[in-house]
Amino acid sequence: MTNIRKTHPLAKIINNSFIDLPAPSNISAWWNFGSLLGICLLLQIATGLFLAMHYTSDTTTAFSSVTHICRDVNYGWIIRYMHANGASMFFICLFLHVGRGLYYGSYTFSETWNVGIVLLFTVMATAFMGYVLPWGQMSFWGATVITNLLSAIPYIGATLVEWIWGGFSVDKATLTRFFAFHFILPFIISALAMIHLLFLHETGSNNPSGMTSESDKIPFHPYYTIKDILGILLLIFILMGLVLFMPDLLGDPDNYTPANPLNTPPHIKPEWYFLFAYAILRSIPNKLGGVLALVLSILILAIIPFLHTSKQRSMTFRPLSQCLFWLLVADLLVLTWIGGQPVEYPFITIGQLASILYFMILLVLMPTTSIIENNLLKW
């Protein structure tokens, strides 16, 4: 009798994806972030569902309903902070996951990579709309500033912005539709994540050496299931440390003030995970140029596979490219810092230089360095 795990139509899919899946024997902890992102998504959907049971998406009661969740609902405070800090953990895992893909050349799996880029955009949109829901000062002004960027689109811009707002400013209609989208998008993300995995399992995982691992595979279970469980425990440990000891560390104090259209906060800034893109947006004096740079700062990932000039897939044996990669990481940290600073000297100049360097590394320096390394191999 054959094992039901291998014959049952549903169990078979799970078996081929998480149990009998042949995996390279040498994948490191950098390959843990896919499963961690899955756990983050499940956690966000679970906590979000319980928050939605008590939240009201009306401008007059939204702020009070969040206060009510924290004060009156049983364990409402922990659900709310797990959801807010869960988003931060989600983005930390996302950035590390994308960074891993860049370092080890995983972008050569073009379908998986492109679905991943769509996932990144969708998660960013979801997080942005979620930030608007508590209807604090930063929620309101963040929504106003970011949606207003669309007015830079020639000819249809102004009409488009008012269509998204559902009126002449960010108001009741905007909040209601943002809540509706924020609720539905995580389920779309789940579907996209399955497509992401489907494409990945067509080719199999990459590995740190960047070479084929067809001759050296091990079953996913128990080897990588136990490794993933360790990663999940660490993730939960860090998340609960944040939630229970410093829940507001990554938030903005301005969001504890109810939204007031008549009073603009001195420094409008998004959540920390958008600051690098926000810094790139602000470093260009032209509105349309800034919006284009903002979109391209993420969309540039789509052309990375076409800029791969190296004879090797991974950066493991390419010290010059490694230096550039870590320079890029440092540059993104500088951009994140600049995004949270006021628009004044010297921050403007630093932001402009960091933005130029960001595009320079990805578009010019990395492909050139790869060619130099190819020639060094001949020596």
UniProtKB/Swiss-Prot annotation:
Keyword Lipoprotein carried by entry: no
GO cellular component labels: mitochondrial inner membrane; respiratory chain complex III
One Pfam family name from the record? Cytochrom_B_C
What the entry lists under InterPro entries is as follows: Cyt_b/b6_C (IPR005798), Cyt_b/b6_C_sf (IPR036150), Cyt_b/b6_N (IPR005797), Cytb/b6-like_sf (IPR027387), Cytochrome_b (IPR030689), Cytochrome_b_C_euk/bac (IPR048260), Cytochrome_b_N_euk/bac (IPR048259), Di-haem_cyt_TM (IPR016174)
Q: Where does heme b b562 bind?
A: 83, 182
The protein's matches in PANTHER family, at most eight in alphabetical order, are given as: CYTOCHROME B (PTHR19271:SF16)
Protein source organism? Bassariscus astutus (Ringtail)
* Location(s) in or outside the cell: Mitochondrion inner membrane
What is the official name of this protein in its record?
A: Cytochrome b
**Cofactor binding, per record:** Binds 2 heme b groups non-covalently.
Identify the taxonomic lineage of the organism of origin. Eukaryota, Metazoa, Chordata, Craniata, Vertebrata
- Predominant localisation class: mitochondrion
